[in-house]
Amino acid sequence: ARWGFLSSQAKQPTIGKTIDESMDAIERENPSLRDVLPKVYARGTLEPTRLGSMIDLIGNIALGDAKARSADVLGHVFEYFLGEFALAEGKKGGQFYTPRSVVELLVEMLEPYKGRVFDPCCGSGGMFVQSEKFVADHQGRVNDISIYGQESNQTTWRLAKMNLAIRGIDSSQVKWNNEGSFL
């Protein structure tokens, strides 16, 4: 599941299968992502050349020194795509994405230096990302906060789990809850 291997296979007609196998490997190594990552690329619904082009595109974004390939860069790329999808979806896209400026304002008002951060409708997890960023920016200890959340839409919950995993944030207490009640 190494990026270098995926990049080297990007032009192969079996790239979809390679991506699915990589997703399985990532889930094995990261139990919090179990049954979260999509494994649909080998089905043939996406043309292998398009998958390869997407791998090349993402690889070009992450080129540079080790710092440029940090979780923060991947997180920003992920957030950018979420924003673009939300714009394309219109009102429906607001279900999983709250603009960064709104989340930043909420976090600044809450000042989550320590304790629990609970988001009952966590969407893609932006509140958790900004809370940890707030703590780090104010020379606090990220381990002094614990995040808890729920999401009723399973696809959106998966987006949150991926978003947090990319940034190295523990998502074990972010649950899928389609019951319509607080956990």
Predicted regions and their residues:
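Conserved S-adenosyl-L-methionine
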Residues: K92-L183
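Non-catalytic, mostly N-terminal accessory regions of nucleic-acid modification and defense proteins
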Residues: A1-Y113, V174-F182
